[in-house]
């Protein structure tokens, strides 16, 4: 894998860059219910509906290593001790104790994390969702509204509420990845995506998919990233499954009630319900892996991994600083009066309007 932590930044780049770490994701988006938070360049930015303070994270000690949004709370693994910090509704009661965490999942009313001791959960336990069963070398944990799942050396185990079958794991062949929605669960195994639990709107009926790289489940829909891009299924009341925008190399996906967000080469993109702020990614969000001061959010930086370049006027793959013909009109910049406009190259009077459009080429007023 050339991107072990799945943050969209190649391992080779992270190994040589300042303040980037190949051992954990430097960039991550996490959505739940009606809000999302983004881990970016060591800080957490949140947006959406702030019912219980869930989009108002406290100041987190660096480095922030992991981020997960729950029903009305959010959590992160932060500081050098790798402890879990939560905020929002009943945050302290939903914060697993201990240090050394490297994986985290916030559910509806509980939170689970993985450290060297295994899986630890905290929060509401009305269905046994925080009573962790015996697990062997767990590598991933996921949390729904009232149930939890883990992937360990023996496969997938789920516990907690099971009224829709969300904790009854079917037969799986070499499972590699898990994800949990409000009351349904999915895994990626050798056959593709396998789902179980509540199947309203066919959210637990995945299409045939291959080469699955990432999986995300929401309350009413599900999505997966494959080599061909993002595929979604389930409820489409707000076009969250059918109107997938154009995405440049999506690497991570996260879902809420009626929203979907993806981390791409051009930053975070969200879609679905647009009647409030839940899909409105803040313009202030900074994603700047090459630390050149130009964000890649929205594709502003055409060269997010090259601090010496930010702009490519003619889209030829060569940055303007190195390109001898920025606008690609066949006239070198040294001889082009309008090096950033391919429509003309002569501007006799230097007024910024090329002679082809200028009604007074020499600027003499006539």
Task: Please name every model-derived segment.
Residues 3-5, 32, 42, 51, ...:
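Conserved consensus positions within extracellular tandem repeat modules
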Residues 3, 7-51, 57, 65-66, ...:
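An edge-strand/N-cap motif at the start of beta-rich repeat modules
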Residues 48-60, 87-98, 123-134, 160-171, ...:
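Short glycine/serine- and acidic-residue-enriched loop/turn motifs that recur at repeat junctions
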Residues 6, 34-35, 52-53, 73, ...:
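Glycine-centered loop/turn positions within well-structured domains
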Residues 35-38, 46, 73-76, 86, ...:
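Conserved core positions of repeat-based scaffolds
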Residues 64-68, 101-105, 138-140, 175-177, ...:
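Repeated scaffold domains used in trafficking and secretory/extracellular systems
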């Amino acid at each position: 894998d050339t991107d072990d932590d799945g943050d969209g930044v190649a391992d080779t780049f992270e190994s040589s860059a300042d303040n980037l770490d190949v051992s954990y994701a430097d960039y991550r988006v996490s959505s739940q219910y009606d809000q999302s938070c983004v881990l970016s360049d060591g800080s957490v930015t949140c947006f959406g509906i702030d019912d219980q303070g869930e989009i108002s994270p406290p100041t987190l000690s660096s480095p922030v290593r992991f981020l997960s949004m729950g029903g009305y709370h959010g959590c992160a693994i932060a500081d050098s001790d790798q402890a879990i910090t939560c905020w929002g509704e009943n945050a302290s009661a939903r914060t697993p104790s201990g240090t050394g965490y490297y994986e985290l999942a916030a559910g509806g009313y509980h939170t689970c994390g993985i450290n060297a001791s295994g899986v630890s959960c905290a929060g509401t336990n009305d269905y046994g969702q925080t009573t962790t069963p015996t697990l062997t070398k767990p590598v991933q944990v996921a949390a729904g509204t009232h149930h939890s799942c883990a992937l360990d050396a023996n496969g997938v185990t789920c516990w907690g509420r099971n009224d829709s079958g969300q904790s009854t794991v079917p037969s799986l062949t070499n499972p590699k990845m898990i994800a949990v929605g409000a009351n349904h669960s999915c895994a990626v195994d050798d056959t593709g995506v396998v789902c179980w639990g509540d199947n309203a709107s066919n959210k637990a009926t995945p299409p045939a998919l291959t080469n699955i790289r990432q999986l995300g489940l929401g309350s009413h829909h599900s999505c997966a990233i494959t080599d061909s891009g993002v595929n979604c299924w389930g409820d489409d009341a707000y076009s969250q499954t059918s109107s997938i925008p154009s995405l440049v190399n999506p690497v991570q996906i996260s879902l809420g009630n009626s929203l979907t967000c993806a981390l791409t080469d051009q930053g975070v993109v969200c879609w679905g319900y647009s009647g409030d702020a839940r899909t409105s990614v803040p313009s202030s969000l900074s994603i700047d892996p090459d630390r050149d001061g130009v964000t890649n959010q929205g594709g502003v930086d055409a060269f997010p991994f090259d601090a010496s370049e930010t702009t490519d006027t003619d889209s030829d793959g060569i940055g303007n600083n190195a390109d001898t013909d920025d606008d690609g009109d066949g006239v070198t910049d040294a001889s082009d009066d309008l090096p950033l406009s391919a429509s003309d190259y002569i501007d006799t009077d230097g007024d910024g309007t090329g002679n082809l459009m200028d009604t007074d080429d020499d600027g003499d007023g006539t």
